[in-house]
Amino acid sequence: YSVGVLVPESSGALIQHLRAGKEWDLDRKRDGLFLLLPQSRTPLSGTGDIDFYSQHLNYLIESKFDYVIKTTSQVLCNIDYRSAFEYHRSTKADVTLIYRRMPQNEKRSPGSVMVSFDKSGWVTDMEIDPPVSKSRNMHMRMCILSKKLLVDIITYAMSRGGGDFIRQLQANVKNLRIN
């Protein structure tokens, strides 16, 4: 495996925790763990996470792997992605979202992305921080997609001023096969 961690500024504790990746068998000369630091102090377009991803396009492009599991540091959980990856491949989805069904009485955190599905399991709507949501399915800010699609999303968004990865997915719910 190859794990690229996009490290925000002031991340000394994270870097110290990850070290060389030995604890996760990622301390190798080829592939392994890569800490990807910001290349500039100012965002390229001023908004969204696409800027940060665009700074590390070469890492993605040069990777020998065909798929990406994209996640965030805002969610802490223990997850084995193997079954999600197999599901992604078996459904021939463009993007597979990792989500959890929220209990009726549980409050959502600010910025939550709520996802609606049709009867076949395909995403029909994504709501970003809605005051009231028609769905109880909260996207965990984790997804599986091809490396090519991720590169395409980043380059498309950058050619239009940057933006946020989730908003790119939201804008393309009808064009992409998202489950």
Across the structure, where does each feature detected by a protein language model lie?
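Unchanged
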Residues: 1-179
